[in-house]
């Protein structure tokens, strides 16, 4: 379970697919459903610098309502619509034991937000 805070209220993330269902944790219960645009065309791993490879629970468009709120809370202003990785962890070396990704393997341009988000993510066509 992933908890997100918006304007001091807690929300519980129900799943990690690109379609995100968020449930408000205060009464009365409010449900928000967000759908996103398809991800960019996958690239091969050798097209990505290894320190940019991430395993993200989902990749969503920066204009998705859930992400616009989160980006605002983090003080991030983006130009244009950009694919954003959500709840990411780095993958250091492909093929070495312990580096598995059961979610979405992506190559991201900006990974400086402690795994909460990663900016400019493109799917990598590989099974880890």
UniProtKB/Swiss-Prot annotation:
Which Pfam families does this entry report, sorted A to Z? Hydrophobin (PF01185)
> What is one GO cellular-component annotation here?
extracellular region
Q: Where in the cell is it found?
A: Secreted; Secreted, Cell wall
Q: Which SMART domains match?
A: HYDRO
InterPro entries documented for this protein: Hydrophobin, Hydrophobin_CS
> What cystine linkages occur within this chain?
48-107, 55-101, 56-88, 108-121
Q: Which residues are glycosylated?
A: 110
Q: Which UniProt keywords apply?
A: Cell wall, Disulfide bond, Glycoprotein, Secreted, Signal
- Supply one GO molecular-function term: structural constituent of cell wall
Question: Which function does this protein serve?
Answer: Aerial growth, conidiation, and dispersal of filamentous fungi in the environment rely upon a capability of their secreting small amphipathic proteins called hydrophobins (HPBs) with low sequence identity. Class I can self-assemble into an outermost layer of rodlet bundles on aerial cell surfaces, conferring cellular hydrophobicity that supports fungal growth, development and dispersal; whereas Class II form highly ordered films at water-air interfaces through intermolecular interactions but contribute nothing to the rodlet structure.
Q: How does it assemble?
A: Self-assembles to form functional amyloid fibrils called rodlets. Self-assembly into fibrillar rodlets occurs spontaneously at hydrophobic:hydrophilic interfaces and the rodlets further associate laterally to form amphipathic monolayers.
State the family it belongs to: Belongs to the fungal hydrophobin family.
Q: What is this protein called?
A: Class I hydrophobin 19
**Which species expresses this protein natively?**
Pleurotus ostreatus (strain PC15) (Oyster mushroom)
- Gene that this sequence comes from: Hydph19
